[in-house]
Amino acid sequence: MYRKYSDGIIEVITGPMYSGKSEELIKRIKILQFANIKTLIVKQKFDTRFSHNEIVSRSGTKLNTIVASNVEEIKKVWNNTYKAIAIDEVQFFDKDIINYIDELASKGIRVIISGLDTDFARKPFGIMPELLAIADDVLKLKAVCFSCKNAGTHTFRITNDKDQKLLGDTESYQARCRKCHLEGEEQKIQMDNLKLNLSL
């Protein structure tokens, strides 16, 4: 999806796990590269699931990136020859990234970011609500529900860990529709109650 803008723009690609966010981000980056628009590609350092310094889609497509854990590390490699920036797993950055992204777009830079909008409990994930609020364009992707094969709109955590930032893949997470997500949470509560009763 190539669109030429004379002014900056913030594009957000979001949705649950397994919905193809990284695939869509890679596709947009490749189109920019084809159009000779120099793009800084950034990956959050926290995400080490598939590769340390690459964005990797589930279809196996890869792109080399710089790795950063905060805005200052991005600023060290940014220069005025870049006309676009793409950031994967943006939800893991702190609030400083919000103003930085807004500033870049205000200077005419095309900003493309991807990340989870909600966590395993269907609650807003980190800084994503603020980023969605300042976005010019939002694409919300859907996965396939692990349980019923309908559209999967939420990320379900198989384990009982409550930490919002818990790195994992198929061993820890599933995509689920609203109904199956709620049923899964209820089943986990029932299992916890059963374990508690057995321990008494």
From Swiss-Prot:
Keyword Zinc: yes
PROSITE patterns linked to this entry: TK_CELLULAR_TYPE
An example molecular function term from Gene Ontology annotations: zinc ion binding
Residues that bind ATP: 15-22, 88-91
Assembly and binders: Homotetramer.
Family statement: Belongs to the thymidine kinase family.
Protein name: Thymidine kinase
The organism of origin for this protein: Mycoplasma mobile (strain ATCC 43663 / 163K / NCTC 11711)
